[in-house]
From Swiss-Prot:
<feature type="region of interest" description="Domain I">
    <location>
        <begin position="1"/>
        <end position="64"/>
    </location>
</feature>
<dbReference type="GO" id="GO:0005737">
    <property type="term" value="C:cytoplasm"/>
</dbReference>
<feature type="region of interest" description="Domain III">
    <location>
        <begin position="149"/>
        <end position="197"/>
    </location>
</feature>
<dbReference type="Pfam" id="PF14520">
    <property type="entry name" value="HHH_5"/>
</dbReference>
<dbReference type="InterPro" id="IPR012340">
    <property type="entry name" value="NA-bd_OB-fold"/>
</dbReference>
<keyword id="KW-0963">Cytoplasm</keyword>
<dbReference type="Pfam" id="PF01330">
    <property type="entry name" value="RuvA_N"/>
</dbReference>
<dbReference type="GO" id="GO:0000400">
    <property type="term" value="F:four-way junction DNA binding"/>
</dbReference>
<dbReference type="GO" id="GO:0009378">
    <property type="term" value="F:four-way junction helicase activity"/>
</dbReference>
<feature type="region of interest" description="Flexible linker">
    <location>
        <begin position="144"/>
        <end position="148"/>
    </location>
</feature>
<dbReference type="InterPro" id="IPR036267">
    <property type="entry name" value="RuvA_C_sf"/>
</dbReference>
<dbReference type="GO" id="GO:0006281">
    <property type="term" value="P:DNA repair"/>
</dbReference>
<dbReference type="InterPro" id="IPR011114">
    <property type="entry name" value="RuvA_C"/>
</dbReference>
<dbReference type="GO" id="GO:0048476">
    <property type="term" value="C:Holliday junction resolvase complex"/>
</dbReference>
<protein>
    <recommendedName>
        <fullName>Holliday junction branch migration complex subunit RuvA</fullName>
    </recommendedName>
</protein>
<dbReference type="GO" id="GO:0005524">
    <property type="term" value="F:ATP binding"/>
</dbReference>
<dbReference type="InterPro" id="IPR003583">
    <property type="entry name" value="Hlx-hairpin-Hlx_DNA-bd_motif"/>
</dbReference>
Amino acid sequence: MYEYIKGKYIDMYKDYIVIENNNIGYKIYTSGSTMAKLPSIGENIMLYTEQIVREDFIGVYGFLTKDELSMFKLLLTINGVGAKAALSLLSISNVSTLKYAIKMGDEKTITRAPGIGKKTAQRIILELKDKIEIDILEEDDEQTINKVTDDKKVLEAVAALITLGYSEKEANKVINSCDKNNSLEQIIKEALKYLMK
């Protein structure tokens, strides 16, 4: 029903924030990832939203990026994963890291989310692994082209750089320029050497 909401960031609670728009305070449920990136209270923000309506509940969920909102909606398609569990998954890491974990079948990372057990993690991997696309960027003269790869070593290297604080775009670009015949450790070292120049 609502594409996004703009307004003044008023307050933060355990699993939701309050945004004021036209003298109305809106309760917006959100993830830990979005909360961590919010500006100071009192500043204006915009969140992309999804409204969930049940017999006993009506709630609005909001995220700073369309990518996180899309991932939230995708997680809700899994049997046994509700809004609370989806927020929990989006709170343990950024969207990129979660995508890589699903693509690589990394149950350990997924089960770090409170309320997500081994069976649910396996179901998430089984149902979403082939639906998730991960862009590996490479330079091709004047343009950058996107391609999807299932190369586990490359995915692990990119995920490692993201964990170290580099953006998905930076990680993808530098890893794609490394020698893929090297070991995972060598690829990461080569990438870090390039990034630290």
